[in-house]
Amino acid sequence: MVKLAFPRELRLLTPSHFTFVFQQPQRAGTPQITILGRMNSLGHPRIGLTVAKKHVKRAHERNRIKRLTRESFRLHQHSLPSMDFVVLVKKGVSELDNRTLTEALEKLWRRHCRLAPDC
């Protein structure tokens, strides 16, 4: 049975982890969300989230976006390549409802899977 947990080792935790992704990323994006990815040697994907107050003013909206993004990653983690992902949000993401946001994330995960050599 496949475990769908979201343990600490599936998260980017330090600034150096984020810098690693920002140096040579593969990009997949929509007008509201961009997911940067870079291959890692860990054998499993990891995710980091950046939801700037500049783009999403209200805390409950930022929390909703992060919660839905983590949940989408958790459900797709076994179909994703061994990459470090950084999710960047842009203006307008707070206007998306939960279903639209989830569908956009699923589309971006599939795009990263197509771009990766080991997926």
Swiss-Prot record:
Coiled coil: none
One GO BP annotation of this record: tRNA 5'-leader removal
Catalyzed reactions: Endonucleolytic cleavage of RNA, removing 5'-extranucleotides from tRNA precursor
One Gene Ontology MF term: tRNA binding
Pfam families: Ribonuclease_P (PF00825)
Superkingdom of origin: Bacteria
GO CC annotation: ribonuclease P complex
Record keywords, A-Z: Endonuclease, Hydrolase, Nuclease, RNA-binding, tRNA processing
SUPFAM superfamilies referenced in this protein's UniProt entry, alphabetically: Ribosomal protein S5 domain 2-like
EC number: 3.1.26.5
InterPro entries assigned to the protein according to its UniProt record, in alphabetical order: Ribosomal_Su5_D2-typ_SF, Ribsml_uS5_D2-typ_fold_subgr, RNase_P, RNase_P_CS
Top-level EC class as recorded in UniProt: hydrolase
Subunit structure: Consists of a catalytic RNA component (M1 or rnpB) and a protein subunit.
Summary of the function given for this chain in its UniProt record: RNaseP catalyzes the removal of the 5'-leader sequence from pre-tRNA to produce the mature 5'-terminus. It can also cleave other RNA substrates such as 4.5S RNA. The protein component plays an auxiliary but essential role in vivo by binding to the 5'-leader sequence and broadening the substrate specificity of the ribozyme.
NCBIfam families named among the record's database cross-references: rnpA (TIGR00188)
Protein family according to the UniProt entry: Belongs to the RnpA family.
Name used for this protein in its record: Ribonuclease P protein component
